[in-house]
Amino acid sequence: MTSQLKRTLTKRYGVLELWEIIVIALFAAFIVILVLSVWLSFRKKSKRSNATTLPVTQSPRFTEEIKEISVDHGSSNNNGTSYQTLDEKFVEDIENGDKFSGSLEKKPLVGSHLPPSTPSTTAPSPLLGLPEVSHIGWGHWFTLRDLQLATNHFSKESIIGDGGYGVVYHGTLTNKTPVAVKKLLNNPGQADKDFRVEVEAIGHVRHKNLVRLLGYCVEGTHRMLVYEYMNNGNLEQWLHGDMIHKGHLTWEARIKVLVGTAKALAYLHEAIEPKVVHRDIKSSNILMDDNFDAKLSDFGLAKLLGADSNYVSTRVMGTFGYVAPEYANSGLLNEKSDVYSYGVVLLEAITGRYPVDYARPKEEVHMVEWLKLMVQQKQFEEVVDKELEIKPTTSELKRALLTALRCVDPDADKRPKMSQVARMLESDEYPVMPREERRRRRNQNAETHRESTDTNKDNDITTDAKI
């Protein structure tokens, strides 16, 4: 048996014996299997890497939660014709040269709390010196341990804000960079949704008047966002006394903050695709740096919309007093909703009042309605914040009031774009509406008044006849 096997294996096939051919074949098969194994392993790793990497150029998508409808430019949501009449009356007063009282005349600028602007320089990256951790297209991927160390294990002393979304902590990274860590609530599904909304809204955008999103943490059930830290408070704190230890905002500082906010919104609405509707514009969401440059923050309610589209919501989100009437009434949302909210903030900065304050007399509870009544009665000096040591000039106040009134127009289609708002506030001209539009409204109001007068006369005649 052994000798027969030996003869078989030593049998020659050409120049090689059979056993040599078998050894060569086995070796070749081993090499092929090894090469295939290495190739498959490399390919698997490559796929896994691609699955966790979001290209920077990829447009954020949120279509599964956005219902788009075409815009009907012919429609309007005019539920307050008296407001339009009031705005028109104010414009006519300006054109006729009506003056404010002498108490608003310009005075020397003293005691300003607005520090001199520092020359703009290229700031070093706040992530400089941090260890390289996995990146997902943008920003920095922080570990839970990183943020625990930064916030002293999320101590109560580190809390700088909270709300229905979660808690915001002040922290310091290992490279000494101060940050604001937004820790979303661990509600099943909701934290992931809020996280995705905010990342898609601001993760890829860059503007000097938008608070910068530095990175994030996704670990277990934890969802956290890491923002640059603004140590100069927000507009609400400055307007309503929480920053009284630093003084009061001057008129110039207020306008500077509002112009910066307008430019940030113009960028979100007009410069990127899909456009971003913030949906929660209010004074507490406008942060400030040491030079009083505005930094718009909190994109937890933001919506991404395509061109010429609205969002229809079954649940109205936002802050009472700032929400646009058409959105509150019908759930119809677009960028003009932000314009209305911005107008409320501008009036808040002018008056120093909250949009809704039930501690005030009944006719003064709603700031927008009260202000329009005051303008109608030509009590312009009464609307200016009493805390302003140096009042704005006549032209400055007119410009700001007219801009705000256009922003809070009850007809959303007649509100200006935010780029126009920024130009209005920076311009030396009054932001009046086109003459043809004013003439049309004037004729419409006159016709309405004439019809009302005729109706009253008919009623009087009927009453006399009965007597």
Curated annotation (Swiss-Prot):
Sequence positions bearing Phosphotyrosine: 227, 327
Signal peptide: 1-35
Extracellular topological domain: 36-123
Enzyme nomenclature, EC number: 2.7.11.1
Entry-annotated residues carrying Phosphothreonine: 314, 319
Biased composition, class Basic and acidic residues, residue ranges: 447-467
Domain Protein kinase: 154-433
Protein origin, superkingdom: Eukaryota
Phosphoserine carried by residues: 70, 284, 313
Annotated stretches, region: Disordered: 102-126, 413-467
Active site: 280
A Pfam family this chain is assigned to: Pkinase
Major localization class: membrane
Cytoplasmic side: 145-467
Keyword terms: ATP-binding, Cell membrane, Glycoprotein, Kinase, Membrane, Nucleotide-binding, Phosphoprotein, Serine/threonine-protein kinase, Signal, Transferase, Transmembrane, Transmembrane helix
Membrane topology: Single-pass type I membrane protein
Molecular function GO terms recorded: ATP binding; protein serine kinase activity; protein serine/threonine kinase activity
Residues reported in the UniProt entry to bind ATP: 160-168, 182
Coiled-coil stretches noted in the UniProt entry, renumbered to this chain: none
Carbohydrate attachment residues: 50, 79
GO CC annotations on file: glyoxysome; plasma membrane; plasmodesma
TM ranges: 124-144
Subcellular location: Cell membrane
UniProt family annotation: Belongs to the protein kinase superfamily. Ser/Thr protein kinase family.
PANTHER family, per the entry: OS01G0323000 PROTEIN, PROTEIN KINASE DOMAIN-CONTAINING PROTEIN
Protein name: Probable receptor-like protein kinase At3g17420
Organism listed in the record: Arabidopsis thaliana (Mouse-ear cress)
